[in-house]
């Protein structure tokens, strides 16, 4: 499977960036893995072959296999469609936090979606969702709650454990949801700003998507997290950012 690139955007008006006379292109994000799996018919094929579970991981982290047996056991016993490995996370750490998002029947889901574009558009039925919330959105979201922000609990860590993109999927459920949705994960834009007013980009940005947003494709299935330790190594980060681990 090979991921295609998408046109880059040069400004807040979403004008296409051009470089050396050609449209500048950038990766669309690892959320494309779901659409690619579906386009190649792999989850449906695996389900027919009797395969039950799929692990997705990122090769910058060499340690997830330490947790695989435990994660599979939890996934089976809890009947999860997707299970995320979570690790202890410091408040404000540049790692997404896994949360349970919920709101009651008196909340307009369209307003929630517009305010936090990472979140799912759901029926106003009081349903909830266990999903990653990116660190740059987590603290602003929590500031509007009694917690007052992304702060430590008695353990010294954030109550919202870190997402490390070690994801276990039930193959049958995944195949069914991909057949319905095409594996198209909702997109977002995360530009790097050149000014305090947030009117100019430092460099062209692009639409992107994330593989950990799969729960947004299966709102009726059970998705959860399993809190682990010593399953994460920041091989992609500079040593000065990783040494404390």
Question: What kind of feature is each model-predicted range?
Answer:
Residues 46-58, 63-67, 72-245:
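Catalytic core of tubulin tyrosine ligase-like
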């Amino acid at each position: 499977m090979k991921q295609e690139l998408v046109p880059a955007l040069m400004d807040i008006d979403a004008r296409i960036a051009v470089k050396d006379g050609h449209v500048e292109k950038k990766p669309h994000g690892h959320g494309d893995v779901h659409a690619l799996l579906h386009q190649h018919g792999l989850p449906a094929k695996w389900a027919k072959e009797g395969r039950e579970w799929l692990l997705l991981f990122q090769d910058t982290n060499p340690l997830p296999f330490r947790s695989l047996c435990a994660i599979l056991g939890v996934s089976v016993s809890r009947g999860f469609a997707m299970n995320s490995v979570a690790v202890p996370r410091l408040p404000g750490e540049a790692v997404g936090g896994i949360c349970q998002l919920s709101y009651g029947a008196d909340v307009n889901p369209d307003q929630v979606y517009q305010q936090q574009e990472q979140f799912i558009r759901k029926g106003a039925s009081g349903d909830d969702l266990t999903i990653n919330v990116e660190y740059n959105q987590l603290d602003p979201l929590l500031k509007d709650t009694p917690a007052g922000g992304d702060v430590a609990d008695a353990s010294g860590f954030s109550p919202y454990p870190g997402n490390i993109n070690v994801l276990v999927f039930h193959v049958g459920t995944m195949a069914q949801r991909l057949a319905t949705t095409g594996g198209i994960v909702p997109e977002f834009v995360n530009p790097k700003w050149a000014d305090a007013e947030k009117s100019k980009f430092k460099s062209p940005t692009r639409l992107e998507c994330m593989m950990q947003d799969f729960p947004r494709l299966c709102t009726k299935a059970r998705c959860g997290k399993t809190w682990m330790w010593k399953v994460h190594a920041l091989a992609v980060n500079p040593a000065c950012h990783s040494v404390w681990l």
